[in-house]
């Protein structure tokens, strides 16, 4: 897939990040992952991001990564495009990007590097090195320690035609407006705050109607219903789902740092699609929290 095709995929629809399946020992569970993708693929997501943040990219080894991406590509071939997460130190990010391209992924989401703070020049060098290492499309992700400014993005886009997408995980509306005004239709834009449904209507008003849904992993019908409500400006449906599910879910998710991933694995377990435990340093939900989440899910009805 050429970069412009990736940009087109990101232009509309709901995106999601499948969980990565682990067994009781915390090792990659290939068969479980295949079954998960087979279950999610028909629900209508425009693309699935393998080994993204919700897929615990930050806990995967370099040896595991190529096999996980290959499994996703092979399982979803001809059904739904696969975009791979890639990130970490520049050389490791390049290894991941090249492995994803070799596996047949449609592009990468370049996740923030780990811990190290850097200025715009260093961030740009990191992004450009990854872009230059592959031919397929790259989506850059503003989050945490990696926050590219409009001028930096413009310079990168001019030098790297395969940089075609921008995902925002910061939530700085002023910065998002500045980036959109600077870059226009040069990029496809993706809302990427945790539990993105809460912010979906606001991002749509900014010119970013596409977002990634973590809850698609366990309530795919509700996730699609909410996306359709946002697309149709159906405020009553949005407000009903926000009040009855997403805001109570948010309260539960915010109890412990790292629960943004843990609660998704908990939800998958509750609906009968157990993905196994999270890897440390994340922790699984407590039994009482599982019961609270189950009550929220049950109230939504069949998926």
Curated annotation (Swiss-Prot):
Q: List, alphabetically, the SUPFAM superfamilies matched.
A: Aldolase
SMART domains under this entry? DHDPS
**What enzyme category does the UniProt record give?**
lyase
Query: What does the record give as the reaction this protein catalyses?
Result: 5-dehydro-4-deoxy-D-glucarate + H(+) = 2,5-dioxopentanoate + CO2 + H2O
Q: Which InterPro entries match?
A: Aldolase_TIM, DapA-like, Dehydro-deoxyglucarate_dehyd
- On the tree of life, the source organism's domain of life is Bacteria
Give the GO molecular function terms. Answer: 4-hydroxy-tetrahydrodipicolinate synthase activity; 5-dehydro-4-deoxyglucarate dehydratase activity
Q: Per the UniProt record, which EC number(s) apply here?
A: 4.2.1.41
Keywords assigned by UniProt?
Answer: Lyase
Which CDD domains does the record cross-reference, listed alphabetically?
Answer: KDGDH
Claim: ATP-binding is one of the keywords in the record: no
One of this protein's Pfam families, by short name? DHDPS
Identify the pathway.
Carbohydrate acid metabolism; D-glucarate degradation; 2,5-dioxopentanoate from D-glucarate: step 2/2
- Gene Ontology terms: biological process: D-glucarate catabolic process
Q: Which HAMAP family match?
A: KDGDH
Query: Cross-referenced NCBIfam families, in alphabetical order?
Result: KdgD, PRK03620.1
| Family designation | Belongs to the DapA family.
From the Swiss-Prot or TrEMBL record, give the protein name.
Answer: Probable 5-dehydro-4-deoxyglucarate dehydratase
Task: Provide the species name.
Answer: Variovorax paradoxus (strain S110)
Highest classification ranks of the organism: Bacteria, Pseudomonadati, Pseudomonadota, Betaproteobacteria, Burkholderiales
């Amino acid at each position: 897939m050429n970069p412009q095709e990736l940009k087109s995929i990101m232009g509309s629809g709901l995106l999601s990040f499948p969980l990565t399946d682990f067994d009781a020992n915390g090792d990659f569970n290939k068969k479980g992952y295949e079954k998960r993708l087979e279950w999610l693929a028909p629900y209508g997501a425009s693309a699935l991001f393998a080994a993204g943040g919700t897929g615990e990219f930050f806990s995967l080894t370099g040896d595991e990564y190529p096999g996980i991406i290959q499994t996703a590509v092979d399982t979803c071939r001809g059904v739904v495009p696969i975009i791979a997460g890639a990130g970490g130190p520049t050389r490791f990010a390049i290894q991941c990007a090249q492995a994803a391209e070799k596996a047949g992924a449609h592009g990468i989401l370049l996740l923030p590097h780990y811990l190290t703070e850097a200025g715009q020049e260093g961030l740009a060098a990191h992004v450009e090195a990854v872009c230059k290492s592959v031919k397929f499309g790259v989506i850059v992700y503003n989050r945490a320690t990696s926050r590219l400014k409009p001028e930096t993005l413009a310079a990168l886009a001019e030098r790297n035609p395969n940089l075609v997408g921008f995902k925002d995980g910061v939530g700085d509306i002023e910065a998002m407006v500045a980036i959109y005004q600077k870059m226009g239709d040069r990029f496809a834009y993706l809302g990427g705050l945790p539990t993105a449904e809460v912010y979906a209507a606001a991002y749509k008003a900014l010119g970013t109607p596409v977002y990634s849904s973590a809850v698609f992993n366990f309530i795919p019908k509700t996730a699609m219903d909410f996306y359709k409500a946002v697309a149709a400006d159906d405020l009553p449906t949005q407000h009903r789902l926000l009040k009855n599910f997403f805001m109570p879910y948010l309260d539960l998710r915010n109890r412990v740092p790292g629960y943004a991933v843990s609660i998704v694995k908990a939800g998958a377990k509750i609906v009968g699609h157990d993905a196994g435990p999270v890897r440390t340093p994340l922790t699984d939900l407590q039994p009482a929290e599982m019961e609270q989440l189950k009550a929220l899910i049950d109230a939504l009805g069949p998926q």
